Amino acid sequence: MNPSIFIILLTTLILGTMMVITSSHWLLAWIGFEMNMMAFIPIMMKNPSPRATEASTKYLLTQATASALLMMAVIINLMYSGQWTITKLFNPTASTLMTVALAIKLGLAPFHFWVPEVTQGIPLTTGLILLTWQKLAPLSILYQISPSINLYLMLTMSLLSILVGGWGGLNQTQLRKIMAYSSIAHMGWMTTILPYNPTLTLLNLLIYITMTFTMFMLFIQNSTTTTLSLSQTWNKTPIITTLTMLTLLSMGGLPPLSGFMPKWMIIQELTKNDILIMPTFMAITALLNLYFYMRLTYSTALTLFPSTNNMKMKWQFSPTKRAPLLPTAIVISTMLLPLTPMLSILL
């Protein structure tokens, strides 16, 4: 792809998201979603291949369906209230449709089927944009309409997402699919707490984006996309491999790493609201995520997959890819837990 065209597409992608985040008018938000989608599809096709074509087609169909549902919800709300303002969502039908549309855009269960398939068909850098930046616009709308969303529908989808995110990643060997299922589970955690404490959702989103950015940057540094290639990185880049394992455990929510903090604070907030069964279910289901991350860490750290001797010592040049933000991202991804008391005061 021509670098100038790529920069224009990237600028349009950023502008579309910013338009959704900053607008208080439904039409402007919808236009922002469309700008974002139309700019992202050519970025997915940057390296043309049948898999990229399939992934971008799936992405287009799901996002177009979600946009149509969103516009239908806006029109129903307009008919009943005469309001274009995002925060004034009064009609229950419009609220339910809006929740479903945004759930499709976020990839919440049971509308999650496109996320692993699309993530697997695109390069690591594009996958990073899909699982981080592309979550900002739908979550910002959910944040604004959180007082009027259908609570039971939202909580059902959130719990399903946590369950699917744990189960789906259990038998995966492709790292991009594992990250996709992890994203589904994290979105479940964020949307569970949204009706009770939206600020906590933003904190969870910030930590999730940092951890996902760190993981993808580490994968890009080593050019690893499968568990087999990850298990063979210890003799090429031992420090990066160690940091990869730490970040994986943090994503699984293992204390005393940063990933444990949002889970702890969400469970604490739910128990403060006298909700006991749901956080218990969430904590037990989170063990599924932790299990496949620990299995991945174990296979990377202690064992080698069956391979011939000449595969064990992979020859290559020293890594020359620059990643200036990586050290900071690793520190935030693994060492944020001691700041929990300060952050809980702010929340």
Swiss-Prot record:
Compartments, as annotated in UniProt: Mitochondrion inner membrane
GO biological processes: mitochondrial electron transport, NADH to ubiquinone; mitochondrial respiratory chain complex I assembly
Membrane topology: Multi-pass membrane protein
EC annotation from Swiss-Prot or TrEMBL: 7.1.1.2
Catalysed reaction, written as an equation: a ubiquinone + NADH + 5 H(+)(in) = a ubiquinol + NAD(+) + 4 H(+)(out)
Keywords, sorted A to Z: Electron transport, Membrane, Mitochondrion, Mitochondrion inner membrane, NAD, Respiratory chain, Translocase, Transmembrane, Transmembrane helix, Transport, Ubiquinone
Record's signal peptide: none
GO cellular component, one term: mitochondrial inner membrane
A single GO molecular function term of this UniProt record: NADH dehydrogenase (ubiquinone) activity
Pfam families xrefs: NADH_dehy_S2_C, Proton_antipo_M
Membrane-crossing segments per the record: 1-21, 25-45, 59-79, 96-116, 122-142, 149-169, 200-220, 239-259, 274-294, 325-345
Role, per record: Core subunit of the mitochondrial membrane respiratory chain NADH dehydrogenase (Complex I) which catalyzes electron transfer from NADH through the respiratory chain, using ubiquinone as an electron acceptor. Essential for the catalytic activity and assembly of complex I.
Similarity-based family: Belongs to the complex I subunit 2 family.
Assembly behavior: Core subunit of respiratory chain NADH dehydrogenase (Complex I) which is composed of 45 different subunits. Interacts with TMEM242.
Name of the molecule in the record: NADH-ubiquinone oxidoreductase chain 2
Annotated organism of origin: Balaenoptera musculus (Blue whale)
Designated gene of the protein: MT-ND2
